[in-house]
């Protein structure tokens, strides 16, 4: 059995789970999320725990088993705790500001770059070089953070750009003149 898939997911207090065929819906203090579990995988609630099972040991079913369990676990964690990704901006003149719910970046381009907050995503700015992306959906939070990082990827020669907090950038040595 899948080591990830066979672990049951404990349902914390204040969280409601509704299973309708392949659709799993989780309601908690921070909101409601749902996911469609792939077809051969079945999900059930037993003794206050969510159990994900597969019909047989076929290769695709084994891989979908762990995936489905992780997706359902992400829902439970999202509606109880939420997800936050912290980011840092490095570079002279590079800064970020909060404009209403949206972010405005100055990244050395001839124009400011505006990132709109999609539904369920909130931004927080600390100073003008640190920001955090928060929400209950792990996939949405990660996608928005990746879009922000792609605005100005880290430069390995000068170390300028946007990076995740704690991310180490391998620095390269530039050309040496004669």
UniProtKB/Swiss-Prot annotation:
Disulfide bonds: none annotated. Part of the 50S ribosomal subunit. This is Large ribosomal subunit protein uL6. This protein binds to the 23S rRNA, and is important in its secondary structure. It is located near the subunit interface in the base of the L7/L12 stalk, and near the tRNA binding site of the peptidyltransferase center. GO terms for biological process: cytoplasmic translation. Signal peptide: none annotated. It comes from the Bacteria. The keyword DNA-binding does not apply. The gene is rplF. It holds the Pfam family Ribosomal_L6. One of its GO terms (molecular function) is structural constituent of ribosome. Belongs to the universal ribosomal protein uL6 family. InterPro entries: Ribosomal_uL6-like, Ribosomal_uL6-like_a/b-dom_sf, Ribosomal_uL6_a/b-dom, Ribosomal_uL6_bac-type. GO terms for cellular component: cytosolic large ribosomal subunit. Keywords: Ribonucleoprotein, Ribosomal protein, RNA-binding, rRNA-binding.
